[in-house]
């Protein structure tokens, strides 16, 4: 028997929302789940190629590792100190 008042609320018809439209329903502990990419618009499933830059990943990579090919210094590891 599960303990009372320790389990999250279960929503058997939780809505998956992509670009403001409900794309599917699933069971979840949240009533609504907002996603940017799902199987209906993912390039692998649709057969199209497009660049997806989520939260500036490319910019972050260029900032961190962009100067390595130009003779720049390597980034420090977390434990290394100068």
Swiss-Prot record:
Keywords: Ribonucleoprotein, Ribosomal protein, RNA-binding, rRNA-binding. One of its GO terms (biological process) is translation. SUPFAM superfamilies: L28p-like. One of its GO terms (cellular component) is ribosome. InterPro entries: Ribosomal_bL28/bL31-like_sf (IPR034704), Ribosomal_bL31 (IPR002150), Ribosomal_bL31_A (IPR027491), Ribosomal_bL31_sf (IPR042105). GO terms for molecular function: rRNA binding; structural constituent of ribosome. It comes from the Bacteria. Binds the 23S rRNA. Part of the 50S ribosomal subunit. Belongs to the bacterial ribosomal protein bL31 family. Type A subfamily. This is Large ribosomal subunit protein bL31.
